[in-house]
Amino acid sequence: MNPPTNPRACSPLARAGSFAPIHVVGGGLAGTEAAWQIAQAGLPVILSEMRPVRQSPAHHTDQLGELVCSNSFGAAASDRAAGLLKEELRQLGSLVIATADCHAVPAGGALAVDRARFSQALTEAIQNHPRITLRREEVTEIPEGIAVLCTGPLTSDPLAKALQAFTGLEYLSFFDASSPIVTGDSLNRAVVFQASRYDKGEAAYLNCPMTEAEYERFWRALVEAEQAPLKDFEREERKFFEGCLPIEEMARRGKDTLCFGPLKPVGLVDPRTGSRPYAVVQLRQEDKAGQLWNLVGFQTNLKWGEQQRVFRLIPGLEQAEFVRFGVMHRNTFLNSPQLLWPTLQFRRRPTLFAAGQLVGTEGYACAVAGGWLAGQNAARLALGLPLITLPPETMMGSLFQFISSADPRHFQPMPANFGLLPDLEGRKLRNKQERYGRYRDRALAALKTTGLVRQVQTA
């Protein structure tokens, strides 16, 4: 079923003054981008940001688009997933990415910014736009009319409760306990085998069998690995983590604890030996194409480098390519596959949009992409124009297709990665650089067919 446009919307030829303002809630990267796109479409916008009236535990200023973690937007090269996403946004006229480009600082192969100048420039752009009204206020209820929610991982309690009431408690998460995801073509298929326990149902899992010696080596590395520190406000709110124990904490309870938990081998036979392994790590399919696989039960708070080192000790994962590392942190996000269309509209209320980390995307550029799409579509809904869904060959199109169609039982936030894209036609390219270049070329060609690409204006 396709998302509807508003049949009562005004004609696109109507005067901008005849439109009610579209309300954007949240002045982070997604909200700033959404407000800009709506205003650039000729429509009035109210952008509500609660800082400094109410400060979040992670922010330090009242500037829009404040970068609370790293100052890096990820890889700059367009043959990298994060770089391709940013290039798509450049071609689509993103304010945030253009501002990042203007305030870039040397960072090797990444796009990093002077965070103070970057946020100041975004704030000035929004304040100076004649169609944007910036309100410093806390929004405690979901706005009426056409609105875009971009309140991020630290959504304030009153609005979070309103979202709970609107979506249903089970569709809103308050912490992110994610397992790592690896690409299917990086697995050692000579070791990994496909099966379900006791051969019940379809063979839905990939299984990495371990001998006792392999398990002991893995267990010892796991309990000795270095964990990522929690932020102060996360340490104060440990209740968010009680429902999902990190695998390294489980391992510390005893050498064999994992063998009776997520690594239990019961009901599985290693076809190489004809017998039950000592332990088994199971991988669950994340996408329809079978390109992304989740390490079941491996929610973790290990540092990312440690995750790669330790988890590559698992037989079959020696050369595993990680598209997402496990995380455990405070993060309010929606079960988007149950709630949203790829247009970022709520299924039960098409005049309400959401974007940013709230919808279950991960990373700065992904937040900007969500803001761009939600802003564009909110404006189009008001104008009575067809709404946008970008081609699945593009990074943006594949990302929002994923978050609106993934298995809702296991949904966790997802970053941009090439595993989301459809397979390339023709023979499989073994050279990763060549393969990623082909993905880029196909994505940018598909983007041009939409008619949305804007001419880059030189200064």
From Swiss-Prot:
Q: Name one GO molecular function term.
A: tRNA (uracil(54)-C5)-methyltransferase activity, 5,10-methylenetetrahydrofolate-dependent
Pfam families found in the cross-reference section:
GIDA (PF01134)
Residues passing through the membrane, by range: none
Q: Which reaction does it catalyse?
A: uridine(54) in tRNA + (6R)-5,10-methylene-5,6,7,8-tetrahydrofolate + NADH + H(+) = 5-methyluridine(54) in tRNA + (6S)-5,6,7,8-tetrahydrofolate + NAD(+); uridine(54) in tRNA + (6R)-5,10-methylene-5,6,7,8-tetrahydrofolate + NADPH + H(+) = 5-methyluridine(54) in tRNA + (6S)-5,6,7,8-tetrahydrofolate + NADP(+)
The record's Gene3D superfamilies line, in alphabetical order, gives: FAD/NAD(P)-binding domain
| EC number(s) on file | 2.1.1.74
The subcellular localization recorded is: Cytoplasm
Q: What keywords would UniProt list here?
A: Cytoplasm, FAD, Flavoprotein, Methyltransferase, NAD, NADP, Transferase, tRNA processing
Q: Which GO terms describe its biological process?
A: tRNA methylation; tRNA wobble uridine modification
- GO CC term, one of those recorded: cytosol
Cofactor(s) this protein requires: FAD
Residues that bind FAD, according to the entry?
A: 26-31
Q: What does this protein do?
A: Catalyzes the folate-dependent formation of 5-methyl-uridine at position 54 (M-5-U54) in all tRNAs.
Q: Which NCBIfam families match?
A: gid_trmFO, PRK05335.1
Q: HAMAP family in the record, alphabetically?
A: TrmFO (MF_01037)
Q: Which family does it belong to?
A: Belongs to the MnmG family. TrmFO subfamily.
Q: Protein name, please?
A: Methylenetetrahydrofolate--tRNA-(uracil-5-)-methyltransferase TrmFO
Organism encoding this protein: Synechococcus sp. (strain JA-2-3B'a(2-13)) (Cyanobacteria bacterium Yellowstone B-Prime)
Upper taxonomic classification of the species? Bacteria, Bacillati, Cyanobacteriota, Cyanophyceae, Synechococcales
